[in-house]
Amino acid sequence: MVEHVPFKLKSEFEPQGDQPQAIQKIVDGVNEGKRHQTLLGATGTGKTFTMSNVIKEVGKPTLIIAHNKTLAGQLYSEFKEFFPENRVEYFVSYYDYYQPEAYVPSTDTFIEKDASINDEIDQLRHSATSSLFERDDVIIIASVSCIYGLGNPEEYKNLVVSVRVGMEMERSELLRKLVDVQYSRNDIDFQRGTFRVRGDVVEIFPASREEMCIRVEFFGDEIDRIREVNYLTGEVIREREHFTIFPASHFVTREEKMKVAIERIEKELEERLKELRDENKLLEAQRLEQRTNYDLEMMREMGFCSGIENYSVHLTLRPLGSTPYTLLDYFGDDWLVMIDESHVTLPQIRGMYNGDRARKQVLIDHGFRLPSALDNRPLKFEEFEEKTKQLVYVSATPGPYELEHTDEMVEQIIRPTGLLDPKIDVRPTENQIDDLLSEIQDRVDKDERVLVTTLTKKMSEDLTTYMKEAGIKVNYLHSEIKTLERIEIIRDLRMGTYDAIVGINLLREGIDIPEVSLVVILDADKEGFLRSDRSLIQTIGRAARNDKGEVIMYADKITDSMQYAIDETQRRREIQIAHNKEHGITPKTINKKIHDVISATVESDETNQQQQTELPKKMTKKERQKTIENIEKEMKKAAKDLDFEKATELRDMLFELKAEG
């Protein structure tokens, strides 16, 4: 039985500006059963706070989808703060590193699946699915991995092991049930997904918990006592009358179903081998027979095998080609989906299926997998649409899909800080570089910063060189710059080491810099992805964190995209100015703390204190290994503290260090 718990929003702020009307409109829309709604929220208007208020008012389990792990991590931290008493969960891919299995026919190279699984994220995924079966006050922040195949939710729910004080049950029966749901006995290395036995006491470490295990004490053939215990210290946290243990894997199957699944796999193998041999693909047939029989043997003996997800269509006894189960199936009938940065996230959801299919088809053609492996896949976009009932799209620049499916945009234009969208000035390209240098110098004199966006790498490089020769402290930000260096450049811009940054695509997250008072768009009239109306509005938004924010577009004609961006920005400015005037608000630049660059933590032998250090350019093998260990330690600590941004940056540093080694 799912427990009903109301959402309790904790915040020192009340909705202000146009947040109250946005909240009310979306809540009314959800209650009226509207399928599609769009929150058009300008940069810095508090969209997350509005989303939180909607969830509180509507009171439905909610799935929030973000387009990458970093963004999902930021949202998870924010929603945890807003809803400390409710179940806020995190569901992203549990791979720190993932190389899917693949085959390159031209070089006859098979690449084995190689992955580094993050145990903490695996625990959070289990916590998310089990929460949905226990309570209805659940918010799950997910990346697009939520549309990838997961086990059958009915099977997952039906296979739970329920223990209650006073229940008649032999100890051996509990152990057998735990093994059936893929827990393994380990009396020495006690960790998630294992249990240990000490006389009449069985201790179970649930897959969904981080530091708490369950101690079940027997008296004869009866459960005498159940307690929650800290697995490290042994300290008793609390007594329990009842506890539900969810399976240790989402791909869990009853024994009788496993037998049927194995028969189905054998039948498919037989048919596929005949096909391959008829086509005279003898090497492929031999390879497939060998690999599949090994997997079948593992399933018979262990109930599991490496890459078991490739047999998911058989394990769940679904017809070939049918829609896979995903996280979406773990929600009940009445729930809500919010898609953050929908103009980026929706195209990502749409594109997942085709990319996955192309890679798997090569493996099937060359005898590495059975054709049914195609059914272990992400959802097609049409299937995603079928499975979701009510959606709220959140974006500063909604895409064509949102515009087409939403009757009326819910606008949120006013910033709590009173900051306005920037003024836009269109200037001719003649003498544009000299004019640009003069504008930058003007900002330098006022201790302000500048972002310059160009269309090509060559233009960026040439412009950076020219500006350096003219005495301007400038750096160039491009896609080949590694994560750590990128963070350093942005920090140095804020600190004043640089006056300006030149780049091609400055829309990536992490470029919200309050010190930037001028954004310059070169070649604004060259139509294309980087100069579309949505891209221009996003770029203009980079100057909306400063009360002196201004945008200069250099162009010889005004394109439709430019006109739309200019008109939209002016419309928003007028709304913001009117609101500030009515309420006596003076716009104020955001004061954002400048963080030190994340760098390797080195322990000083004398003081044993942690200190920040720049990564040396050259290191011995031993120094590199020590640095890697320190960064790994710091990364895990950051993840534990829910500082996912920092953890992600440290992870990228690790990849760079390992690649260089």
Swiss-Prot record:
One of its GO terms (biological process) is SOS response. The beta-hairpin motif is involved in DNA binding. It comes from the Bacteria. Residues 603-624 are annotated as: Disordered. Residues 625-660 form the UVR domain. The keyword Protein biosynthesis does not apply. It is found in: Cytoplasm. GO terms for cellular component: cytoplasm; excinuclease repair complex. Forms a heterotetramer with UvrA during the search for lesions. Interacts with UvrC in an incision complex. PROSITE patterns: HELICASE_ATP_BIND_1, HELICASE_CTER, UVR. Keywords: ATP-binding, Cytoplasm, DNA damage, DNA excision, DNA repair, Excision nuclease, Nucleotide-binding, SOS response. ATP binds at G41, A42, T43, G44, T45, G46, K47, T48. Residues 28-414 form the Helicase ATP-binding domain. A motif (Beta-hairpin) lies at residues 94-117. The UvrABC repair system catalyzes the recognition and processing of DNA lesions. A damage recognition complex composed of 2 UvrA and 2 UvrB subunits scans DNA for abnormalities. Upon binding of the UvrA(2)B(2) complex to a putative damaged site, the DNA wraps around one UvrB monomer. DNA wrap is dependent on ATP binding by UvrB and probably causes local melting of the DNA helix, facilitating insertion of UvrB beta-hairpin between the DNA strands. Then UvrB probes one DNA strand for the presence of a lesion. PANTHER family: UVRABC SYSTEM PROTEIN B. This is UvrABC system protein B. The keyword Transmembrane does not apply.
